[in-house]
A protein has these predicted regions:
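Terminal hydrophobic/aromatic helix or amphipathic segment near a protein terminus
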Residues: 215-260, 299-300
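NAD(P)H-binding glycine-rich loop region in Rossmannoid oxidoreductase-like domains
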Residues: 32-72, 76-78, 93-96
Length: 317
């Protein structure tokens, strides 16, 4: 039996659905009270923590407070005799300044508050659970229906006719479908080594390619314009300076670095050790599942027929 913490959220929903294909699953919201958490965790062997503890869409400040949700989960897991915790973190803990592909041996150089907070969560969890098996997953850039940070903002701009991207969105990234993160969770639950962190990826592509595919699926025609990275960063820095701590900001400097700097991972180690592989190898493969969601995003007015815009081999601009 598997318990997923983060039900009702983007990643939690996809992880639950992927796990349910292979094993019985209990879903729990991140804000469930202690009594509900205690009741749910009694009968499970593995707990998957994939709730959004920090939102990259907000102006964050780094602090060393023990992660409240993880602390509650750990205490409940101890009382219930849970065998293993699979914690979904992020490849962003390595920081934004790696030119070569990241491996598990790459240096951890987090810069942004979000990156540092996520790494602190990992460290706290591993140091505080010597009596429990903990496996950490570090997914590359996650995409899929329900994603609530990048695509809603970018698609709203697309619907208005143009979107400005650092470097034109042509910098190579590693993406992974949210459902494949769920499959990696199952592999980590069965075969991950306690105390280890694994990178998990899907395929290499660009933000520009994701937006072009999304625009076709949603029936939106738009121009993608290249903005110099330095100018995009300066604009984001100005926006953040005007925002209160914890307030939403778009685009923030983290978003600019997410689009404008390379973030590629080499997950060959996890594929060998966990004996898993992703099922989604391109944006186009997932677009039939994403089309309705994309076309219903706030500010997006378009048709759902991909043929209405342009064939897949034609650039939007």
């Amino acid at each position: 039996m598997h318990l997923v913490i983060g039900a009702g959220e983007f990643l939690g929903n996809h992880v639950s659905a992927a796990l349910a294909v292979q094993a019985p699953v209990i879903e729990l919201n991140a804000d469930a009270d202690d009594e509900t958490l205690g009741d749910a965790i009694k009968s499970v062997e593995v707990v998957h923590t994939c709730a959004e503890t920090w939102s990259p869409a907000h102006r964050l400040r780094f602090r060393r407070d023990p992660p409240r949700l993880l602390n509650r989960v750990v205490q409940a897991a101890r009382r219930a005799g849970v065998r293993r915790i699979v914690h979904v973190s992020t490849a962003d803990v390595y920081g934004p300044d790696h030119i070569a592909k990241i491996t598990e041996r790459s240096k951890l150089r987090p810069t942004h508050a979000y990156e540092r907070l996520k790494l602190f969560e990992e460290s706290w969890l591993l140091e505080s659970t010597q009596d429990l098996e903990v496996v950490v997953l570090r997914p590359a850039r996650i995409f899929g229906p329900g994603e609530n940070w990048m695509l809603p903002h970018l698609m709203r701009s697309m619907a208005r006719g143009r979107v400005w991207l650092p470097g034109g969105g042509r910098v190579m990234q590693t993406f992974i479908a949210a459902e494949d993160v769920g499959r990696a969770c199952l592999a980590a639950a069965d075969r991950g080594k306690p105390g280890k962190a694994y990178l998990v990826g899907g395929f290499d592509a660009t933000w520009r390619e994701l937006l072009e595919s999304s625009a076709r699926a949603a029936g939106v025609g738009a121009e993608i314009i290249s903005l110099p990275y330095d100018l995009a960063y300066l604009r984001a820095l100005t926006a953040e300076a005007a925002a209160a701590a914890g307030a939403p900001v778009w685009p923030g400097v983290f978003a600019v670095d997410t689009i404008g700097k390379p973030h590629q991972v080499d997950d060959s180690h996890s594929r060998r050790e966990l004996t898993w592989s992703p099922s989604v190898g391109s944006f186009e493969q997932l677009m039939p599942q994403m089309a309705a969601w994309l076309s219903e995003l706030p500010g997006v007015e378009g048709r759902r027929e991909p043929e209405a815009i342009s064939p897949p081999n034609r650039s939007l601009s």
